[in-house]
């Protein structure tokens, strides 16, 4: 049984999602958004870092998964996104968690079945897979999808290990 914290980083809104994964059983624990608004960048990063540290302290996840950086058209946006990711990653690493990274395409493929899925499809599948009464907000749904992707990858790795096969997973950074 593992508690997984998924994070969808952003310079203004960072989504988070917590699930419990035991074999094929998935249980929703919590999700939401860390909204930092128009504060100076250093304060935004501090808020992301501390908010995730509080969640990690409260739920004690064993796994941490985050979306990889994609190249945005606007270099300034890409830099800010990278900084938000850094704050989230350091928060996890400070708690001794290994950081697992997945591309947006990997996440969509694992949750929806196609790497080209749109946000509404991701929200719908997250709602269905976790048995939620309503669709989560988009950033929280993305974070839950990242956690679900990691749970799926863990199951694939375990299955392949039992059969002696090889499997390629997301990148892993050890603290």
Swiss-Prot record:
**Gene3D superfamilies under this entry?**
Ribonuclease H-like superfamily/Ribonuclease H
Annotated Mg(2+) 2 binding lies at 67
Function per UniProt: The RuvA-RuvB-RuvC complex processes Holliday junction (HJ) DNA during genetic recombination and DNA repair. Endonuclease that resolves HJ intermediates. Cleaves cruciform DNA by making single-stranded nicks across the HJ at symmetrical positions within the homologous arms, yielding a 5'-phosphate and a 3'-hydroxyl group; requires a central core of homology in the junction. The consensus cleavage sequence is 5'-(A/T)TT(C/G)-3'. Cleavage occurs on the 3'-side of the TT dinucleotide at the point of strand exchange.
Which amino acids does the record list as binding Mg(2+) 1?
8, 139
- GO MF entries: crossover junction DNA endonuclease activity; DNA binding; magnesium ion binding
The record's comment on cofactor binding reads: Binds 2 Mg(2+) ion per subunit.
**Which metal ions or organic cofactors does this protein require, according to UniProt?**
Mg(2+)
Is this entry keyworded Metal-binding? yes
Q: Which Pfam families match?
A: RuvC
Top-level taxon of the source organism:
Bacteria
Q: Supply the EC number(s).
A: 3.1.21.10
Keyword list (alphabetical) reads:
Cytoplasm, DNA damage, DNA recombination, DNA repair, DNA-binding, Endonuclease, Hydrolase, Magnesium, Metal-binding, Nuclease
GO cellular component annotations of the record? cytoplasm; Holliday junction resolvase complex
State whether it acts alone or in a complex, and with which partners, per the record.
Homodimer which binds Holliday junction (HJ) DNA. The HJ becomes 2-fold symmetrical on binding to RuvC with unstacked arms; it has a different conformation from HJ DNA in complex with RuvA. In the full resolvosome a probable DNA-RuvA(4)-RuvB(12)-RuvC(2) complex forms which resolves the HJ.
In Swiss-Prot or TrEMBL terms, this protein is called Crossover junction endodeoxyribonuclease RuvC
Q: Which reaction does it catalyse?
A: Endonucleolytic cleavage at a junction such as a reciprocal single-stranded crossover between two homologous DNA duplexes (Holliday junction)
* Active-site residues, record numbering mapped to chain: 8, 67, 139
Record's subcellular location = Cytoplasm
The record ties this protein, via PROSITE patterns, to: RUVC
Q: Which InterPro entries match?
A: RNaseH-like_sf, RNaseH_sf, X-over_junc_endoDNase_Mg_BS, X-over_junc_endoDNase_RuvC
Gene Ontology BP annotations? DNA recombination; DNA repair
Q: Organism, per UniProt?
A: Marinobacter nauticus (strain ATCC 700491 / DSM 11845 / VT8)
Q: Which family does it belong to?
A: Belongs to the RuvC family.
